């Protein structure tokens, strides 16, 4: 079977499970990498300058 009935089976298992490196629930079990820290994709921690922002709008380091 393909198409619309098959898409109903996609919500049985969780897409993201807890990451071993960052501890967040962002590790894609099927693809094998973390969306938050990049574990499984690279040795370096995934980090961007636009990630953190203070309440007054000033960006943190």
Curated annotation (Swiss-Prot):
Its cofactor is Zn(2+). GO terms for biological process: translation. Zn(2+) binds at residues 19, 22, 34, 37. A zinc finger (C4-type) spans 19-37. InterPro entries: Ribosomal_eL37, Ribosomal_eL37/eL43, Ribosomal_eL37_CS, Ribosomal_zn-bd. Binds 1 zinc ion per subunit. Keywords: Metal-binding, Ribonucleoprotein, Ribosomal protein, RNA-binding, rRNA-binding, Zinc, Zinc-finger. GO terms for cellular component: cytosolic large ribosomal subunit. GO terms for molecular function: rRNA binding; structural constituent of ribosome; zinc ion binding. PANTHER family: 60S RIBOSOMAL PROTEIN L37, RIBOSOMAL PROTEIN L37. Belongs to the eukaryotic ribosomal protein eL37 family. Binds to the 23S rRNA. This is Large ribosomal subunit protein eL37. The lineage of its organism: Archaea, Thermoproteota, Thermoprotei, Sulfolobales, Sulfolobaceae.
